[in-house]
Amino acid sequence: MTRQEVLDGLKEVIAVLRPATDLSEVNFDTELVRELGIDSLSMIMLSLATEEKFQMRFPDGEAAPTTVGEVCDAVLKALA
């Protein structure tokens, strides 16, 4: 799976969690909190939905991602 494929899948997750988001503006550098309005509860929901979407688990104790690209990288790392 490529980083772009993960981004495309993550956009599907974001579309459900944040339906008002213009997905054409979401890229690897998009900031989760400042640009998407992801708060702590939304971050948990994003993590759970991403794990379900990609059939993987994020490791415990990892620093919380701050950008969409960091989420993509964490997914790829977990799938490796």
Predicted regions and their residues:
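Phosphopantetheine-attachment site and its flanking helix in carrier
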Residues: 34-52
